[in-house]
């Protein structure tokens, strides 16, 4: 396909019969690509490798860099930039038509393994090597591999070994600076007697790789459903009333200062004009909390609805709480606060969730504490998202929503104390 001398830039293309979701090309009589449409039928489509001349790159790379720096286009494929570029006609890029079965694209390891049996046992992949060792099987016995939706911290994929499915967690970029995996492992060991977590098959404190059992008949919590709320809060009550003691504390002030330092030490600007004022408010909340005697027990801290797993067993659903990487000793009401802000609850919804958890009407101190942790949680995850966004991740409006919690619930906290 490639030659010693290539006179022009080109994109490989294969003919697609019938309807396709591939990127279809329109060309001039001389083969210059003049338009790209996402999806089409009975057309040549972008498929396989691409070649750029130095002259093309000299003009194209600045445009590509500008699109990457722009929030509205940062998450695009690089071909989106090309799509806009070809309409101008300069510099030129041509179609490189390939015969049928000349070019293959592989979207996953499973597709590659189906095409070339060599990769069934020689994937050259760290996760596959690990699974092979953990289960004492050849890589060819690891099947049905598919990616799961990426979380906000990690990526995971599903696989099957000996007719049973498992999940392998791969820590996301930069998480080694954010997560203490030894503490996470200790959290699982501490909470094990309650039998409320996912079943862990393998955990590596150094790499953060984790393999756990996949529950076939399961779903995540829906916090707009009052019955799901009740079951999730019942599990949190069970956790908190056990009064488990971990060797690791979740100190929200320390975490706030830690993430702030991560942002500023990497030359990142915190993009809020009133940041210093809001931070001062958060320090006041921390002082208020420290002046109030509150219990400290093992708490989950990352109590987003997706971490409550409803597993069907016969005619009942058993609730499990997964992913304990942020857990530590803390005020149990921090778990309720995190449930609220992760679910984007308003004040009325948050008050109701607190009632469900306590199984009674909260007192003034409990309302004030909930609002304080909602504000502090919002502030903490704002800094977390700012840092992660500078690592190349995109959280849409999440950062703004969390910052709004910090601002609003500071005032709600103070209003309650004045009552």
Which sequence ranges carry the predicted segments?
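Conserved core of the sugar-phosphate nucleotidyltransferase
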Residues: 1-73
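Conserved alpha/beta core of the MobA/IspD/sugar-nucleotide pyrophosphorylase nucleotidyltransferase superfamily
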Residues: 45-130
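Conserved NTP-binding catalytic cores of kinases and kinase-like/nucleotidyltransferase enzymes
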Residues: 92-199, 208, 297, 311-319
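ATP/Mg2+ or Mg2+-diphosphate-binding catalytic cores
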Residues: 110, 116, 120-123, 383-419
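An alpha-helical support segment within catalytic cores of ATP-dependent transferases
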Residues: 126-141, 244-301, 305, 311-313
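ATP-binding pocket architecture of kinase catalytic cores
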Residues: 146-253, 260, 264-277
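Catalytic activation segment of kinase domains across protein kinase-like and atypical kinase folds
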Residues: 309-335
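Active-site activation/catalytic loop segments of kinase-like enzymes and analogous catalytic loops
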Residues: 333-362, 375-393
């Amino acid at each position: 396909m490639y030659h010693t001398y290539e006179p022009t830039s080109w994109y490989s293309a294969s003919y697609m019969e019938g309807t396709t979701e591939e990127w279809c090309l329109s060309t001039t009589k001389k083969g210059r690509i003049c338009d790209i449409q996402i999806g089409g039928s009975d057309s040549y489509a972008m498929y396989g490798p691409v070649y750029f001349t130095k002259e093309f790159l000299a003009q194209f790379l600045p445009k590509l860099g500008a699109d990457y720096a722009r929030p509205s286009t940062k998450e695009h494929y690089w071909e989106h930039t090309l799509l806009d570029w070809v309409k101008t006609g300069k510099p030129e890029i041509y179609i490189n038509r390939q015969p049928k079965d000349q070019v293959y694209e592989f979207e996953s390891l499973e597709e590659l393994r189906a095409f070339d049996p060599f990769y069934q046992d020689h994937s050259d992949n760290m996760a596959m090597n690990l699974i092979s060792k953990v289960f004492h099987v050849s890589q060819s016995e690891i099947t049905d591999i598919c990616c799961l939706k990426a979380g906000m911290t990690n990526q995971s994929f599903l696989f099957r070994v000996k007719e049973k499915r498992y999940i392998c967690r791969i820590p996301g970029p930069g998480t080694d600076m954010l997560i203490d995996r030894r503490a996470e492992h200790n959290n699982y060991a501490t909470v094990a007697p309650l039998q409320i977590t996912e079943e862990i098959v393998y955990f590596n404190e150094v790499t953060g790789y984790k393999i756990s059992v996949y529950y076939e008949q399961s779903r995540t919590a829906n916090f707009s459903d009052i019955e799901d709320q009740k079951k999730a809060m019942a599990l949190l009550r069970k956790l908190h009333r056990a009064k488990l003691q971990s060797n690791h504390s979740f100190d929200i002030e320390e975490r706030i200062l830690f993430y702030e330092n991560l942002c500023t030490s990497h030359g990142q600007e915190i993009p809020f004009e009133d940041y210093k004022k809001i931070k001062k408010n958060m320090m006041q909340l921390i002082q208020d909390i420290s002046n109030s005697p509150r219990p400290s027990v093992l708490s989950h801290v990352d109590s987003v609805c997706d971490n409550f797993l409803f597993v069907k067993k016969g005619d009942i659903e058993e609730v499990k709480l997964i992913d304990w990487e942020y857990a530590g000793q803390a005020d149990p009401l921090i778990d309720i606060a995190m449930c609220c802000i992760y679910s984007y609850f308003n004040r009325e919804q948050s008050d109701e969730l607190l009632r469900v958890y306590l199984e009674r009407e909260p007192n003034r101190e409990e309302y004030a504490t909930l609002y304080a942790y909602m504000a502090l949680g919002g502030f903490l995850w704002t800094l977390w998202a700012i840092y992660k966004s500078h690592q190349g991740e995109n959280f849409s409006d999440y950062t703004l929503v969390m910052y709004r919690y910090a601002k609003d619930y500071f005032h709600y906290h103070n209003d309650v104390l004045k009552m």
